[in-house]
Amino acid sequence: MNPAHLLVLAAVCISLSGASSIAPQPLNLIQFGNMIQCNNTRPSLDFSGYGCYCGRGGSGTPVDELDRCCQVHDNCYGEAETVHECDPYWTFYSYECSEGKLTCKDNNTKCKEFVCNCDREAANCFAKAPYIDSNYKNCK
């Protein structure tokens, strides 16, 4: 793995570790970060702290289309926890990246399939949405 990707992963994990009142736990964001890199040239770390929903927590009104992608992803993870009774941060799934196209592979549980699709749809949304530099660290 590229050292820059490891740095991004560490920064995202550190920023998300304070997202709950329980003791911080290792979070599985490796796959999501790699999915983002599959179809986006912007470094994954650029998304953490963007708008009101990208990164740790999320509240208020999304500032733009990209921030809405993060809000939808947050809600998707929430649904994984409540409806599918799984922890999306600990769920490892199978996927493929080929020529910028993401495909969730044959995952043997509903939880894995659901979380994979949360991440795939968010990565695709990130790739399509404009990134407005002034919205980084700018929740209005």
Swiss-Prot record:
Predominant subcellular localization, coarse grouping: secreted
Cofactor, free-text remark: Binds 1 Ca(2+) ion.
Glycosylation sites: 39, 107
Enzyme Commission number: 3.1.1.4
Record keyword NAD present: no
Superkingdom per UniProt: Eukaryota
Membrane-spanning residues: none
Keywords on record: Calcium, Disulfide bond, Glycoprotein, Hydrolase, Lipid degradation, Lipid metabolism, Metal-binding, Secreted, Signal, Toxin
Gene Ontology BP terms: arachidonate secretion; lipid catabolic process; phospholipid metabolic process
Family: Belongs to the phospholipase A2 family. Group I subfamily. D49 sub-subfamily.
Protein name, UniProt field: Phospholipase A2
Source organism: Micrurus altirostris
